[in-house]
Amino acid sequence: MKKIQTSRADAKTVFDSIGSAMRNGRKHQNATNYAAMRDDVHQQLDEYDQRVKPISLENLVSLWPTRRTNMDEAKTAHDMYSTSKNEIKQIRAELETLNGGKVIKCPICELDYYAHLDHYIPREVMPEFSVHPKNLIPLCDYCNTKKSIDWLSHASRRRLIFNCAYDTPSGMMVLECRVKRILNDYPVCVVDYKSGLPANSAVSLECSTYHNLKLRPKYKAEVDNMLKTEMLRVMGEYVDNSNLFQSRLDFWNRKKNIYQSMMTIGTTVERLFNDALCNSPILDSWVVNNLLV
């Protein structure tokens, strides 16, 4: 997972721009609700901004139902977010400009391209932040769906999901990947947490994110496919160049040196892939025994 640049739009300006365009309809009194809650929501938006550096969003308390009883206003705040609104389109365009264009990789899994602006604090939980630009994070379909509304442990008041805009990554790989068996003539891996990880908040939050979004099985499936493709390529390369090496082991060790040089670069799944290639004795034995001239 990685850090992104977030929108610079002012939260109160966005809220007022959307709210001032609201009209009262037959079933809802949106304009009246906006006017009634405006000052309270402004205070909440200011408090959100004060809690991103350093990040302490877990200490926020929603206006509803703790401090307010009008749930019709909460629904109005919740429904202010819509991908069709110009203000949201502008935030999305800004995020794309700041983070590499429309083909932004999901900053959580780094596997798929982003498809949604996810509400880090779910609008079902705190609707007053439904259009806060700093609360909108570009995520892929998978991570957006898995995250759902479970962002906070109510028992410990600790956040469960890494905030790609304001959390600082631990700087280390908390996962490892090993080939554990050969199935149908192809290596099969296991992705697990590293042992002996330091007990600090950054590492704990990353582990919690992988767990709650169920990313380890997704990484495993991806690495298994990558290993299958790579093994076919390696076998073909040895057939074409076997005369350049002293032995099959010599060839494989040289390949591993290349993988080793790439273990600290690339996306999470690319690093797990190279980890499996370099640190799996079962794979070493299988490759050397199956290289053919």
Where is each model-derived feature located?
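Alpha-helix initiation/capping motif
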Residues: D10, T69-A74, H132, P138-C140, ...
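Short cysteine-rich loop/turn motifs with clustered Cys
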Residues: A93-H116, C140
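N-terminal accessory alpha/beta regions
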Residues: K2-I88
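C-terminal, charged low-complexity interaction regions
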Residues: M1-H28, V203-V293
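Short Cys/His-rich Zn2+-coordinating modules
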Residues: S82-L95, D118-V125
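Glycine- and acidic-residue-rich phosphate-binding/metal-coordinating active-site segment common to enzymes
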Residues: Y113-L197
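Short flanking/linker segments adjacent to small metal-binding domains or redox-active Cys/His motifs
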Residues: V179-A221
